[in-house]
Amino acid sequence: MARITTEDCTGKISNHFDLTLVAARRARQLENGNTPLVDDVRNNKPTVTALREIAAGHIGTELLTRNK
């Protein structure tokens, strides 16, 4: 599996601050048992999985406006 970088995600969320908030909130959701939206997450930490979901376009800034 290739390494994920923030540059892979900035095409989807251009504001670095929003990117950080979205990734953190999604990682928290994954830690609390939400189902990952990308395949092959067995060795990834929740933060890496969250970034992969953002890079794939599954998660975006709409997560910031939704209720937790």
Swiss-Prot record:
N-terminal signal peptide: none
InterPro entries (alphabetical): DNA-dir_RNA_pol_omega, Pol_omega/Rpo6/RPB6, RPB6/omega-like_sf
Enzyme kind, highest EC tier: transferase
Lineage: Bacteria, Pseudomonadati, Pseudomonadota, Betaproteobacteria, Neisseriales
Function as written in the Swiss-Prot or TrEMBL entry: Promotes RNA polymerase assembly. Latches the N- and C-terminal regions of the beta' subunit thereby facilitating its interaction with the beta and alpha subunits.
EC number: 2.7.7.6
Family (UniProt): Belongs to the RNA polymerase subunit omega family.
Biological process terms in GO annotation: DNA-templated transcription initiation
HAMAP family per UniProt: RNApol_bact_RpoZ
GO cellular component, one term: cytosolic DNA-directed RNA polymerase complex
Subunit: The RNAP catalytic core consists of 2 alpha, 1 beta, 1 beta' and 1 omega subunit. When a sigma factor is associated with the core the holoenzyme is formed, which can initiate transcription.
Pfam family, one: RNA_pol_Rpb6
Catalytic activity: RNA(n) + a ribonucleoside 5'-triphosphate = RNA(n+1) + diphosphate
UniProt protein name: DNA-directed RNA polymerase subunit omega
Classification via Gene3D superfamilies: 3.90.940.10
This protein's UniProt keywords: DNA-directed RNA polymerase, Nucleotidyltransferase, Transcription, Transferase
GO molecular function: bacterial-type RNA polymerase core enzyme binding; DNA binding; DNA-directed RNA polymerase activity
